[in-house]
Amino acid sequence: MLGDGKEGTSTIPGFNQIQFEGFYRFIDQGLIEELSKFPKIEDIDHEIEFQLFVETYQLVEPLIKERDAVYESLTYSSEIYVSAGLIWKTSRNMQEQRIFIGNIPLMNSLGISIVNGIYRIVINQILQSPGIYYQSELDHNGISVYTGTIISDWGGRLELEIDKKARIWARVSRKQKISILVLSSAMGSNLREILENVCYPEIFLSFLTDKEKKKIGSKENAILEFYQQFSCVGGDPIFSESLCKELQKKFFHQRCELGRIGRRNINSRLNLNIPQNNIFLLPRDILAAADHLIGMKFGMGTLDDMNHLKNKRIRSVADLLQDQLGLALARLENVVKGTIGGAIRHKLIPTPQNLVTSTPLTTTYESFFGLHPLSQVLDRTNPLTQIVHGRKLSYLGPGGLTGRTANFRIRDIHPSHYGRICPIDTSEGINVGLIGSLSIHARIGDWGSLESPFYELFCKSKKARIRMLFLSPSQDEYYMIAAGNSLALNRDIQEEQAVPARYRQEFLTIAWEEVHLRSIFPFQYFSIGASLIPFIEHNDANRALMSSNMQRQAVPLSRSEKCIVGTGLERQVALDSGVPAIAEHEGKILSTDTEKIILSGNGNTLSIPLIMYQRSNKNTCMHQKPQVRRGQCIKKGQILADGAATVGGELALGKNILVAYMPWEGYNFEDAVLISECLVYGDIYTSFHIRKYEIQTHVTTQGPERITKEIPHLEGRLLRNLDKNGIVMLGSWVETGDILVGKLTPQMAKESSYAPEDRLLRAILGIQVSTSKETCLKLPIGGRGRVIDVRWVQKKGGSSYNPEIIRVYISQKREIKVGDKVAGRHGNKGIISKILPRQDMPYLQDGRPVDMVFNPLGVPSRMNVGQIFECSLGLAGSLLDRHYRIAPFDERYEQEASRKLVFSELYEASKQTANPWVFEPEYPGKSRIFDGRTGDPFEQPVIIGKPYILKLIHQVDDKIHGRSSGHYALVTQQPLRGRSKQGGQRVGEMEVWALEGFGVAHILQEMLTYKSDHIRARQEVLGTTIIGGTIPKPEDAPESFRLLVRELRSLALELNHFLVSEKNFQINRQEV
C-alpha cells in the first residue's frame, strides 16, 4: 500500500490483530503452560494418585452460531477435554479417561467474545515492568537520598536505601527497615559469601557491629530477626517450620517472585547472567543491587525514568486469560482433593470422571468477563467505535493506578510514546492520560513491550537499501530517527537538507546522512481516531482529542455518504470493523435479497446471510444492504454488502453539507447551530434506533405467572396490539403506555377483600379463590415506534432460577431536531438551536440556500483551523465531483502546502463551473451571500464550504425529562437526581440568588418547601389540589434544615430560633 518503486513497501496491519494474536497466544501456549502446572494429587494414605496428561488436550468447536448466542443469551464458548489418569499405587493399575473440565469463551476474528449474549472485549493494561529501578529524592535537609526499588511480578515492592553513613537498608514496610546483611543471611548467604560477591566489601564491613554479627551468625538467627522486624512481633520468637512458611508466603512469594520478564530486566540492569528459569530473587541479585546503589551514591550510573515505556509492560488478553486459568485450576485442585477424601471415607471407588467438575473453570471465566474492570461491554455505536475499543490501553485496573492516585507526570506524553501510544487520543475527565490508544503500526512484542516499525537506511555509493525492523522502546534509544516517511521526495534533494530527528528522548535537526532510521508512514504516531482527521496538523491538540472521541459517538445515518475530504484510512477501518460483507471466494451471484446473497463458485453454492435490523448496545441500528446484482461475477475480497455507516466499503459517519460561518440573529451564540428544514424533510440526518424491552416470568410461591391477553380492568385500546398469546404482534405501531406483553402474577388476597360469593365457596366447598395482579410490560415514555422483532427465550430447566424471558425490539425513526448535538471532525461541536424554513436561510450567488450556519467565533480562540481548509476543499470537491485523500504534515514538502492545494482547487472549480464567486482573489475562500428573509447581501463576505458533519448519539429524545411526582432521598427527603430515577430539577445556591434578585418570593418558597423536602406541606398540596382549596403555607422548617440541626446537635451545639408574634411582637422561644 505504501512506498514507491525504489523503496521497501509496508502495509497497514489489521486493526484487530492485537486482540486476536493475544487470544491465539493464549490457546497456543498459555493453555498448555497452565495445565502442565497442575500437580499430582494424592489421598491422605498415599494410595491413590490423580494426574492430568496435558499433551492431548482438545478444544471442541461450539455447537451454536454467534448470532444465536446473542439472541438466546448464551456464551459462545468451546468445551475443553483433557486426559486424566487415576493410579492405584499398591496394584500399579491405572485408569485413564477423557474428561470435560469446563468451557472457555472464544474470541471471533474481530477480537470480540460473546458472554451471556453480550458482546465483550478485554482491553490491554499497562503496568510497571518487574525489575529494579533507581531513583533519587531530596530529604527534608535538601540532601539526595538514593533508593533502589525491586518490583515483583505481582506488583509487590522491596526498597533498598542508602543513608548518610553509606549503610544500606531494606525497607520491608513503611515503618520497618532491616540491614541488607540480615536480609541476605535470611535468604541463605553467610558473611564470607556476601563479602566475596560485592564490589565494595569495605563499605559492608564498616557497618557490621557486634550486634549485627550476632544477628547474621546463623541463618536461623537472621530469619528470626527478619521475622521480628517484618511482622512487628515483640519478645523473642522461636524458630520453627511454620514461621518459615509464613515468611515465605507473606514476604518472599509476594515481593520476590520476578517472573520471566523481571528476571530478564534485572539481568540486563545489573549485568548478571543468572539463567532465565530462575524467576525468584536470589541473594546475588540483592548484593548486585546494593553495589549499584553504592555506585549511585558516589556519582556512577544513571537513574531510571519510571515513565519511560521500556520500564512498562503490556498485560494483554493472553496474560489475563492465563491468570484466570491458573486461578480456576487451583480451585479444581481443591475440589479433586476433597472428592478423593470423600470417596475413600465412604468406601467408594473413584474414577477420573467422578473426581472432576467443570464448574470452577466455567464460573471463573464467566465472572472474569462479567466483573473484571478490564473486561468491558463492547461499544458498538458505529464501526469506528467497535474497532477503536479493542485497541485501548489502560493504566487502571488491578495492579495498576487509580484516577485519584495518578500524578500529572504519569498522565503526560513521554517521548518514548512516539509511534507506540497516540499522543492525542485519550479520554476526557478524571481518566485523562490514563486511558490511551495504540498507534496504527504498534504491536506487542514477546516480552510485553510495545514495538514500532522503522526503515533502516544503508547508504553506500548513492544506492540506498532499505530494511524494515520493529524496535522496542529500549532499542530505539541509540538511533537517530528521522521523521521522514515512505511518501518522501526525491532522495537527491533530501540528502542536501536538514531533517527533524529524535535521539535519546530529545528532538533535534540533523543532516540527512546522519540518520540511522526513519518512520515509515505519516500516520505512524497516531491512533485510528486521530488518523481520520484531515489537516490535523492545523488543529490544536485538545480539539483533535475531542474530535477523535466524538467520531466514536457518531450515529449511523439512514443514508450514509462518503466524505469529500478524507485521509485515505477510511476503507481500512471499514474493512477491519467487519461491518461490510466481504466475498471469501470468487464466483457468480445467483440471487440477492435483503436477507441473504447466494453465490456460486468452485462447484459449490454458498448462502451468505446479511444482518437485518440488528440492535447495538447503544441502541443504534446495524443493517447490511447488498451492493451486487444477480449474474455479476465477483472476486475474492470484493464487497458484497455495505453495513451501517459504510459506503462502497469506506467509513461514512456523516454528511457533506453546505455550511456558512457567520452569526445569525444570535441563534448561533456559544456554539449553537442553526439548520435548514431541508435536513429534516430530506431525511439527511435521519437515523434509526432499536430499543429492547424485556420481561421475565417466574414461578412464585402462589403459582406460576401467566402470559395472557385476558387482563381485567384495562382498557381495550391498550391491548389492541396483542395476539392470542398476549404478546405484541410483529409490525404493529405502539405508543407510550401500550401493553407489549400481558402478564398476570397470582397472589393471595386478604379475607376482607373477598366478595360474599367467594367467601361462601370457601366456607361450604373449601375452594381456595386466588386473585391475580397485573404486571404487564408497558411501553415507557419516549418509546413509540414499530415492533420489528419478538423473541421468547426459554432457558434449559425452566425453574424459577431460569425464568423465561420475552424480548420485544422496537425501531424508532429519529429526524434531527432542536437539542440534538452535531460535530465536525475538528472538535467543533454544537447543539441545534433553531430549524429555519429554507426560504429564510442565507443563500449563495447561484441561489442555493445553505444547510447549516456555524459561529465564526468558534474558530480563532480554539485554534482548530483545519475545519476551514476542509470546508473550502469540500466545496471545490463537490463542484468538481472529486474526492480528496490527504496525508497529514504536508508542510514538510513546501511551505503553505495545504493553503496552496485548497486555493488551486477552488480556482479550478470556479473556472470549470464558470462560477467566479467560488474563488474571488480579493477574499479567497470567502463569498458574498444573501439574507433569505430580505434578499439583501450581507455586509461582509462569508466563508462557505462543504465540511463533513456528524450527528452524535447525544440526542434530545434521550435527555429531555420532566418530573411530576417521584421518589425522595431517605436522609434529606429531597427529590432524587437524574432521569433514570425520575429525579427533580436541581435548585442550588446560585439559582436561589437569581430568584431572590427578581424578588419572586412565592416561587422561591415553593421551590424550597412543597417541591422539595417539606414533608407535611407536600402531602397537604396533593389533598388541596384534588379538593380545590387554597394551598396552606408551610409552618415549620423543611426536613434538610432539621437534618442540619440534628447534625449540629451531635456536635453538642444546640440551635434555637425565635418566632415574633404578629399581634404584640412578643418573642416566643421555641426549640427547633
From Swiss-Prot:
Give the GO biological process terms: DNA-templated transcription
Alphabetical keyword list: Chloroplast, DNA-directed RNA polymerase, Nucleotidyltransferase, Plastid, Transcription, Transferase
What's a Gene Ontology MF term here?
A: DNA binding
Write down any Gene Ontology CC term.
Answer: mitochondrion
Q: Any idea where this protein resides?
A: Plastid, Chloroplast
Catalytic activity, as annotated: RNA(n) + a ribonucleoside 5'-triphosphate = RNA(n+1) + diphosphate
What is one Pfam family matched by this protein? RNA_pol_Rpb2_2
Please list the disulfide bridges.
Answer: none
Which EC number(s) does UniProt give? 2.7.7.6
State the SUPFAM superfamilies in the record: beta and beta-prime subunits of DNA dependent RNA-polymerase
SUBUNIT field: In plastids the minimal PEP RNA polymerase catalytic core is composed of four subunits: alpha, beta, beta', and beta''. When a (nuclear-encoded) sigma factor is associated with the core the holoenzyme is formed, which can initiate transcription.
- Give the family from UniProt: Belongs to the RNA polymerase beta chain family.
NCBIfam families the record matches: PRK00405.1
Q: What biological function has been recorded for the protein in this entry?
A: DNA-dependent RNA polymerase catalyzes the transcription of DNA into RNA using the four ribonucleoside triphosphates as substrates.
Name-wise, this protein is DNA-directed RNA polymerase subunit beta
Q: What is the lineage of its organism?
A: Eukaryota, Viridiplantae, Streptophyta, Embryophyta, Tracheophyta
What gene makes this protein? rpoB
